[in-house]
Amino acid sequence: MKAITLLSSGLDSVAALAIAAEDFDIEMAITFDYGQRAREREIEYSRKVCEYFGIEHRVIKLDWLSEITSTSLVNRDVEVPSLSFEDIGEAAPAEITDASAKAVWVPNRNGVMLNIAGSFAESRECEYLVVGFNGEEAGTFPDNSLDYVKAMDRAFFYSTQNGVKILAPLIELGKTEIVRRALEAKAPLEYSWSCYRGEEIPCGECESCVRRARAFKNAGVKDPLLERLGI
Protein backbone atom coordinates (compact mmCIF):
# COMPACT_ATOMS: atom_id res chain seq x y z
CA MET A 1 0.00 0.00 0.00
CA LYS A 2 1.18 3.50 -0.83
CA ALA A 3 1.19 6.56 1.39
CA ILE A 4 2.23 10.20 1.54
CA THR A 5 3.48 11.61 4.82
CA LEU A 6 3.15 15.07 6.34
CA LEU A 7 6.61 15.87 7.69
CA SER A 8 7.47 18.85 9.88
CA SER A 9 10.68 17.16 11.12
CA GLY A 10 9.19 17.15 14.62
CA LEU A 11 9.54 14.15 16.92
CA ASP A 12 6.01 12.98 16.14
CA SER A 13 6.08 13.24 12.36
CA VAL A 14 9.52 11.60 12.10
CA ALA A 15 8.40 8.77 14.39
CA ALA A 16 5.17 8.30 12.42
CA LEU A 17 7.10 8.16 9.15
CA ALA A 18 9.54 5.56 10.49
CA ILE A 19 6.74 3.38 11.84
CA ALA A 20 4.65 3.67 8.66
CA ALA A 21 7.68 2.86 6.50
CA GLU A 22 7.81 -0.58 8.11
CA ASP A 23 4.59 -1.60 6.35
CA PHE A 24 3.85 1.01 3.68
CA ASP A 25 5.49 2.30 0.52
CA ILE A 26 6.04 5.99 1.29
CA GLU A 27 5.79 7.83 -2.01
CA MET A 28 6.60 11.33 -0.81
CA ALA A 29 6.91 13.58 2.23
CA ILE A 30 5.37 17.05 2.26
CA THR A 31 6.70 19.88 4.42
CA PHE A 32 4.75 23.13 4.67
CA ASP A 33 6.25 26.60 4.89
CA TYR A 34 3.64 28.94 6.35
CA GLY A 35 6.05 31.50 7.73
CA GLN A 36 6.64 29.68 11.02
CA ARG A 37 9.70 30.73 13.01
CA ALA A 38 11.28 27.30 12.70
CA ARG A 39 10.66 26.85 8.98
CA GLU A 40 14.35 26.89 7.99
CA ARG A 41 15.20 24.20 10.53
CA GLU A 42 12.08 22.19 9.70
CA ILE A 43 12.80 22.21 5.97
CA GLU A 44 16.50 21.43 6.44
CA TYR A 45 15.87 18.58 8.86
CA SER A 46 12.95 17.18 6.86
CA ARG A 47 15.20 17.02 3.83
CA LYS A 48 17.76 15.01 5.81
CA VAL A 49 15.05 12.66 7.08
CA CYS A 50 13.86 12.09 3.51
CA GLU A 51 17.42 11.38 2.40
CA TYR A 52 17.66 8.82 5.20
CA PHE A 53 14.54 7.03 3.97
CA GLY A 54 15.26 7.61 0.28
CA ILE A 55 11.95 9.31 -0.45
CA GLU A 56 10.91 12.36 -2.42
CA HIS A 57 10.62 15.59 -0.45
CA ARG A 58 8.34 18.45 -1.46
CA VAL A 59 8.08 21.84 0.24
CA ILE A 60 4.81 23.74 -0.22
CA LYS A 61 4.65 27.43 0.62
CA LEU A 62 1.50 28.85 2.19
CA ASP A 63 2.27 32.56 2.27
CA TRP A 64 -1.38 33.48 2.73
CA LEU A 65 -1.54 31.41 5.93
CA SER A 66 1.28 33.42 7.48
CA GLU A 67 -0.52 36.63 6.50
CA ILE A 68 -3.63 35.71 8.50
CA THR A 69 -1.77 34.29 11.52
CA SER A 70 -1.02 36.67 14.37
CA THR A 71 0.22 34.22 17.02
CA SER A 72 3.79 33.65 18.19
CA LEU A 73 4.43 30.61 16.00
CA VAL A 74 4.63 33.00 13.04
CA ASN A 75 4.75 36.53 14.47
CA ARG A 76 8.18 37.28 15.95
CA ASP A 77 6.77 40.32 17.73
CA VAL A 78 4.76 37.98 19.97
CA GLU A 79 6.62 36.01 22.63
CA VAL A 80 6.56 32.21 22.59
CA PRO A 81 5.50 31.05 26.10
CA SER A 82 8.15 29.37 28.26
CA LEU A 83 7.04 26.33 30.27
CA SER A 84 8.49 23.84 32.74
CA PHE A 85 7.92 20.15 33.48
CA GLU A 86 5.54 21.21 36.24
CA ASP A 87 3.49 23.28 33.80
CA ILE A 88 2.70 20.23 31.67
CA GLY A 89 2.22 17.80 34.55
CA GLU A 90 -1.10 16.19 35.44
CA ALA A 91 -1.46 18.45 38.48
CA ALA A 92 -0.86 21.64 36.50
CA PRO A 93 -3.80 24.00 35.90
CA ALA A 94 -5.28 23.48 32.44
CA GLU A 95 -5.11 27.24 31.92
CA ILE A 96 -1.33 27.03 31.43
CA THR A 97 -1.33 24.60 28.51
CA ASP A 98 -4.50 26.16 27.10
CA ALA A 99 -2.74 29.54 26.98
CA SER A 100 0.34 27.98 25.41
CA ALA A 101 -1.75 26.25 22.74
CA LYS A 102 -3.59 29.47 21.96
CA ALA A 103 -0.27 31.33 21.66
CA VAL A 104 0.95 29.03 18.85
CA TRP A 105 -2.35 28.31 17.11
CA VAL A 106 -2.49 28.73 13.33
CA PRO A 107 -6.00 29.05 11.83
CA ASN A 108 -7.16 25.65 10.54
CA ARG A 109 -3.55 24.66 9.85
CA ASN A 110 -4.00 20.91 10.00
CA GLY A 111 -7.18 21.07 7.96
CA VAL A 112 -5.45 23.04 5.21
CA MET A 113 -2.42 20.75 5.16
CA LEU A 114 -4.43 17.54 5.13
CA ASN A 115 -6.59 18.67 2.25
CA ILE A 116 -3.58 19.69 0.17
CA ALA A 117 -1.85 16.40 0.95
CA GLY A 118 -5.08 14.58 0.15
CA SER A 119 -4.99 16.03 -3.37
CA PHE A 120 -1.46 14.72 -3.86
CA ALA A 121 -2.44 11.33 -2.46
CA GLU A 122 -5.38 11.01 -4.82
CA SER A 123 -3.34 12.12 -7.85
CA ARG A 124 -0.65 9.54 -7.06
CA GLU A 125 -3.12 6.79 -6.21
CA CYS A 126 -1.94 6.64 -2.61
CA GLU A 127 -4.39 5.21 -0.12
CA TYR A 128 -3.06 6.85 3.04
CA LEU A 129 -1.76 10.07 4.55
CA VAL A 130 0.67 9.52 7.43
CA VAL A 131 0.46 12.02 10.30
CA GLY A 132 2.07 12.40 13.72
CA PHE A 133 -1.14 13.11 15.64
CA ASN A 134 -0.82 11.67 19.13
CA GLY A 135 -2.67 11.12 22.36
CA GLU A 136 -0.65 13.57 24.43
CA GLU A 137 -1.18 16.62 22.23
CA ALA A 138 -4.82 15.78 21.54
CA GLY A 139 -5.60 17.06 25.02
CA THR A 140 -4.76 20.64 24.06
CA PHE A 141 -4.95 20.48 20.25
CA PRO A 142 -8.29 18.95 19.17
CA ASP A 143 -7.07 18.65 15.58
CA ASN A 144 -4.68 15.95 16.84
CA SER A 145 -7.46 13.76 18.20
CA LEU A 146 -8.96 10.47 17.05
CA ASP A 147 -12.30 12.22 16.55
CA TYR A 148 -10.61 14.61 14.14
CA VAL A 149 -9.00 11.75 12.23
CA LYS A 150 -12.37 10.04 11.87
CA ALA A 151 -13.98 13.29 10.70
CA MET A 152 -11.28 13.85 8.06
CA ASP A 153 -11.57 10.25 6.87
CA ARG A 154 -15.27 10.87 6.39
CA ALA A 155 -14.58 14.08 4.47
CA PHE A 156 -12.03 12.36 2.22
CA PHE A 157 -14.63 9.68 1.47
CA TYR A 158 -16.58 12.40 -0.32
CA SER A 159 -13.75 14.59 -1.61
CA THR A 160 -11.37 11.98 -3.09
CA GLN A 161 -12.23 9.34 -5.64
CA ASN A 162 -9.99 6.74 -4.02
CA GLY A 163 -11.19 7.42 -0.47
CA VAL A 164 -7.89 8.56 1.02
CA LYS A 165 -7.55 7.67 4.71
CA ILE A 166 -5.41 9.05 7.52
CA LEU A 167 -2.84 6.76 9.10
CA ALA A 168 -2.01 7.97 12.60
CA PRO A 169 0.22 5.33 14.25
CA LEU A 170 0.76 7.47 17.35
CA ILE A 171 -2.86 8.40 17.99
CA GLU A 172 -3.07 6.60 21.34
CA LEU A 173 0.50 7.26 22.51
CA GLY A 174 2.07 9.79 24.83
CA LYS A 175 5.46 11.33 24.07
CA THR A 176 7.45 8.85 26.15
CA GLU A 177 5.91 5.92 24.28
CA ILE A 178 6.54 7.76 21.01
CA VAL A 179 10.26 8.04 21.81
CA ARG A 180 10.48 4.34 22.59
CA ARG A 181 8.56 3.30 19.49
CA ALA A 182 10.59 5.67 17.30
CA LEU A 183 13.86 4.18 18.52
CA GLU A 184 12.53 0.68 17.86
CA ALA A 185 11.70 1.75 14.30
CA LYS A 186 15.19 3.25 13.92
CA ALA A 187 13.83 6.73 13.26
CA PRO A 188 16.60 9.30 12.63
CA LEU A 189 15.73 11.37 15.69
CA GLU A 190 19.05 13.17 15.46
CA TYR A 191 17.40 15.07 12.60
CA SER A 192 14.08 15.74 14.30
CA TRP A 193 13.39 19.34 15.28
CA SER A 194 10.70 20.22 17.82
CA CYS A 195 11.50 23.77 18.95
CA TYR A 196 8.96 26.47 18.11
CA ARG A 197 11.58 29.23 18.16
CA GLY A 198 13.78 27.87 15.39
CA GLU A 199 17.17 29.21 16.49
CA GLU A 200 20.50 27.43 15.97
CA ILE A 201 19.83 25.16 18.94
CA PRO A 202 16.56 24.20 20.68
CA CYS A 203 15.45 26.72 23.29
CA GLY A 204 14.51 24.04 25.82
CA GLU A 205 11.71 26.26 27.15
CA CYS A 206 8.81 26.28 24.69
CA GLU A 207 6.06 23.72 25.23
CA SER A 208 7.28 21.53 22.39
CA CYS A 209 10.85 21.44 23.74
CA VAL A 210 9.65 20.73 27.28
CA ARG A 211 7.40 17.86 26.21
CA ARG A 212 10.26 16.40 24.18
CA ALA A 213 12.74 16.71 27.05
CA ARG A 214 10.33 15.05 29.47
CA ALA A 215 9.71 12.21 27.04
CA PHE A 216 13.40 11.37 26.62
CA LYS A 217 13.97 11.68 30.36
CA ASN A 218 11.09 9.33 31.14
CA ALA A 219 12.26 6.91 28.45
CA GLY A 220 15.69 6.84 30.08
CA VAL A 221 17.61 7.72 26.91
CA LYS A 222 19.56 10.72 25.69
CA ASP A 223 18.07 12.89 22.97
CA PRO A 224 19.98 12.04 19.75
CA LEU A 225 19.50 15.60 18.47
CA LEU A 226 21.12 17.16 21.53
CA GLU A 227 23.94 14.62 21.37
CA ARG A 228 24.60 15.49 17.74
CA LEU A 229 24.58 19.21 18.55
CA GLY A 230 26.92 18.65 21.49
CA ILE A 231 24.43 19.92 24.08
From Swiss-Prot:
Protein residues bound to Zn(2+): C195, C203, C206, C209
Swiss-Prot/TrEMBL cofactor(s): Zn(2+)
CDD domains according to UniProt: QueC-like
Gene3D superfamilies linked: HUPs (3.40.50.620)
Top-level taxon of origin: Archaea
Matching Pfam families: QueC
Cofactor annotation comment: Binds 1 zinc ion per subunit.
MF annotations from Gene Ontology: ATP binding; ligase activity, forming carbon-nitrogen bonds; zinc ion binding
EC number from the UniProt entry: 6.3.4.20
Keyword terms of this UniProt record: ATP-binding, Ligase, Metal-binding, Nucleotide-binding, Zinc
UniProt: ATP binding residues: L7, S8, S9, G10, L11, D12, S13, V14, A15, A16, L17
InterPro entries: QueC, Rossmann-like_a/b/a_fold
Biological or metabolic pathway of the protein: Purine metabolism; 7-cyano-7-deazaguanine biosynthesis
Catalytic activity annotation: 7-carboxy-7-deazaguanine + NH4(+) + ATP = 7-cyano-7-deazaguanine + ADP + phosphate + H2O + H(+)
Broad class of enzyme this protein falls into: ligase
Similarity comment text for this entry: Belongs to the QueC family.
Function field: Catalyzes the ATP-dependent conversion of 7-carboxy-7-deazaguanine (CDG) to 7-cyano-7-deazaguanine (preQ(0)).
HAMAP family: QueC (MF_01633)
Protein's name in the database: 7-cyano-7-deazaguanine synthase
The gene coding this protein: queC
